[in-house]
């Protein structure tokens, strides 16, 4: 198993896909996706475009759907939800499909939608991602951060480092595919005992703090809360593996 870390979808190699892509958007799309499936959502369907989300979701029964839209960290007017994992409750989500469009995470998912294996990870379900990689042993793996509008993000990189570090701790052998893997592990080693403070310093963490989303940061900075691994079952549609 050879692992590569890419900080944003724009930095991935052109005309290339891995055997397995692990998409990461800790603040907050992949945290929200895992949480929604954990509390009973039937599936999460992701869209880069808000217009595409609305058009597709119109064909779904109203009582069986929820629409979640986020841009710039804030909820989009006219949608049922924004992108907070704390809004994902079993009372709201059970048996429904969540139609989701966010600023960054859904773009990353679009980049690798044709991968043979596509899963999503965050700190809250890091262990589930590691277990999946250990069991399936894909030849090449991309840990793909979503970043922020094409730029680097601390939170996605530290999550990639957390995944690689846990693989090492469990004795699961892998080859380092690029220097970004080493850098991500180093960042995680430095901050693993103080992830919330790291998130407070991250640019997107600061955006969310200005929107009074401290509890979102606290939740997203917690490791191994959820044993669910979202996996793509058809383009853009994720269910619990």
UniProtKB/Swiss-Prot annotation:
InterPro entries: ComB-like, ComB-like_sf. It is an enzyme of class 3 (hydrolase). Its cofactor is Mg(2+). Transmembrane segments: none annotated. Keywords: Hydrolase, Magnesium. Its EC number is 3.1.3.71. It comes from the Bacteria. SUPFAM superfamilies: ComB-like (SSF142823). Belongs to the ComB family. This is Probable 2-phosphosulfolactate phosphatase. The gene is comB.
């Amino acid at each position: 198993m050879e692992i590569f870390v890419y900080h944003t979808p724009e930095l991935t190699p052109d005309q290339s896909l891995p055997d397995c892509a692990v998409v990461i958007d800790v603040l907050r799309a992949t945290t929200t996706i895992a949480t929604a499936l954990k509390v009973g959502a039937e599936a999460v369907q992701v869209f880069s475009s808000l217009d595409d989300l609305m058009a597709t979701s119109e064909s779904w029964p109203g009582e069986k759907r929820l629409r979640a839209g986020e841009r710039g960290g804030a909820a989009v007017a006219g949608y049922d939800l924004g992108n907070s994992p704390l809004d994902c409750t079993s009372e709201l989500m059970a048996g429904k499909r969540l139609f989701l469009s966010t600023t960054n995470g859904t773009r990353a998912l679009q980049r690798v939608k044709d991968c043979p294996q596509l899963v999503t990870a965050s700190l809250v379900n890091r262990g589930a991602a590691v277990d999946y990689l250990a069991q399936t042993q894909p030849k090449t793996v991309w840990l793909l951060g979503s970043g922020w509008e094409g730029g680097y993000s601390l939170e996605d990189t530290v999550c990639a480092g957390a995944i690689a570090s846990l693989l090492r701790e469990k004795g699961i052998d892998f080859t380092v595919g690029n220097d970004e893997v080493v850098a991500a592990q180093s960042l995680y080693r430095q901050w693993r005992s103080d992830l919330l403070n790291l998130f407070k310093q991250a640019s997107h963490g600061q955006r969310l703090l200005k929107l009074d989303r401290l509890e979102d940061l606290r939740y997203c900075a917690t490791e191994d809360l959820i044993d669910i691994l979202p996996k793509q079952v058809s383009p853009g549609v994720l269910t619990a593996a």
